[in-house]
Every structure is written in C-alpha cells, then in structure tokens.
C-alpha cells in the first residue's frame, strides 16, 4: 500500500493528522500515544467540517491546562525517549524534531541542540508531530509520496516579528523539494502562510518521492481541514491510500535508499550505542555496526546506515559528529520488504500487536511488537519470555 500526500493547498501538522485519521488511522490509539508523551496536557478531538464545499476532518488539539510553550530540543527528546510508545513512532518523532532543529539552527546561526523552540515546542505541535508519526505507523504504507508543497506568499507576524512567507525555517526545510506559491487562480492578492514548519518537516521526514499522484487503485481518501475557511479554495490536505498494479502490487514495500558507511578503528567502544541512536534520530531508516579486521591486523568497526534521500545530509552530519571517521562512503540500494499488516491478541487483558508479513498474498512471518511485550511484562510482573509464551498458539507461526 502507498500513501500520497496532496499539499497543493498547503500543509500543517493538524491538517495532515486529520487527513490520516479520515483515511483510517485510529484516533483513540493516537490519543493514548500522545498522552504517554505529554500526560494530561492535551485532548484530541476530530470534527467533520466543510471548507469551501469540501468536507473534511478538523483535528482539534485542546489544552487541558495552561502550558509553557517554549522548550529546548533536549527537553522534547527527553519526553519522547522516556515515553512508553511504539519504537517506530518514537524514532520518527525524534527525526522530525531533529529536522526542524537543524533548520532553525541554520536560520539563527546556533547549534541545533541549543534551539529554543517557540511555536513548534508548544504542546499542540508536539501532539501534531507525535500523532502523525503514530498514524503513519498504524497505516503502515510501503511507499510515501507527496505533491509539490504550496508555501503561500506575503508577510505574517511570528515570535520574531513581521517576517516574509515562506518563513525562514520553512525555506530551509523545503530545500530540494518542489514547491509552488499556492496563489489563487485569477487573483494576485497575498494568501499568507500555507505551509508550516511542522507540516513541511513531516513531509520531508516521511516522503521519499515527489510529484503528482503516482497512479494505482485508490483505496481511501482522507481529508484534513485547516482552521480557516478561506475563499477561493478548500483549505485542506488530502491523504490518499492506494494500491499499485503489476509487479509492485505484489510487494509495495520496495524503496530506493542511500547506504552510508564508514570504517572506524579508534572509537571508544562505549560510545557506539549513542552513535547508532544519533543516526536514527537524524533520520536513518536503519543503522547497525559490524566488526571488521583492517590492514595491519587492526580491529575496527563498519558503521552503516540506510537513509532516505531527503535525510542524507542530516545523517552524514550526525555520523561525522558522533564518530572519529574522516570519510563516508555512499551508494544507492533498493530495499525490498514484505507487505505488512497488524492484528491484535489479548494476553491476560493486555493488547499485543502482531506484525504479519506477506508476499504475493501469502503470509510468511508473524511477530509480536516488542514494546507491547515489554509493557505487558511490566504490568503483569512477569518476564517478557513468559508473555511471549502466553500468546495464543498459531498467532506467531
């Protein structure tokens, strides 16, 4: 299954989340994940609205009490790392915040780790980012593509005063991605800001292909509505779930990625765990370490990462910063995976998600999600091995 995001009328985090919920992601589970990151802070509420004749879902992120809207990247990372949420959701959210921090750091000329988030550090933006990451984990598309992004034009008031559209952080985030002004037909009036840093960062983190709808069999169309009902065009984002035909349909999870590698023989071995984590946070799809023997019999390691093209520079920066290497090799690879879906089983009142992999319509593999196993083990006061043993027979065969 593929996902195409239509951002030709702009994109914001809450609009994209509304579209994904309309396409089939479960709001209740998303609320649980957001609650685990920022407990008691926000309530998510989906409302069906109409924008210039187009129905859609307006996702409301409602504060439960007063909040401090300014947070450093380190604080947000701590919230995510300590949260008991699916690992994929956690790593994707960390990656999105890292992209925004890198863009903001470049704009303000400071280290991304020292970035003091304003609007993006607010509770609603954290909920948007975590919510979208969880929604995409639930829908589990093998391919994610997106249209050119409508940016808008004119000037807006922000935390740093009156600034032009696109705002500086958005201008950094869209580098290398097709854009358009989003001007209304038969009008030259400024339309203001159509794309927010949160919305753009989510597309840049997830989408590996740009352009119009890739074609295929459309299964679901989710519509996410913005707050304003502006004249002349529906203020919406579309999330289109589709199946491809022919060879790709038998296994849609085939992606072209970039593999980065470096040989390192003088790294403190205690630092390797942090190296792998930094690569994943920077946007790597996967990262690993391989022991090797170099010339003159020197023991060393090869550190490797699989990366979407949009995250190559960020991951290279993280690799240089976290290791002693002076060079990185890179080349394109094609990764083929199984078509995936999730089913649920109960173990002593605790839900365990089972990831099932299939190819050409035949189930090949079924494995329980480890985060669910760990949560159940803690709640029941038993070992993770015992939880696995209690899963109904045949579920993981």
UniProtKB/Swiss-Prot annotation:
Documented EC number(s): 4.99.1.12
Q: Which GO terms describe its biological process?
A: protein maturation
User: Which InterPro entries does its entry note?
Assistant: Ni_insertion (IPR002822)
Question: What's the domain of life for this entry?
Answer: Bacteria
Q: Which cysteines are joined by disulfide bonds?
A: none
Q: Give the matching Gene3D superfamilies.
A: mk0293 like domain, Transcriptional regulatory protein pf0864 domain like
Whether Lyase counts among this entry's keywords is yes
Q: Does the keyword Lyase apply?
A: yes
Q: What class of enzyme is it?
A: lyase
Keyword terms of this UniProt record: Lyase, Nickel
Q: Which NCBIfam families match?
A: nickel pincer cofactor biosynthesis protein LarC
Q: Please report which protein family the annotation says this sequence is part of.
A: Belongs to the LarC family.
Protein task: Involved in the biosynthesis of a nickel-pincer cofactor ((SCS)Ni(II) pincer complex). Binds Ni(2+), and functions in nickel delivery to pyridinium-3,5-bisthiocarboxylic acid mononucleotide (P2TMN), to form the mature cofactor. Is thus probably required for the activation of nickel-pincer cofactor-dependent enzymes.
Task: Please give the name of this protein.
Answer: Pyridinium-3,5-bisthiocarboxylic acid mononucleotide nickel insertion protein
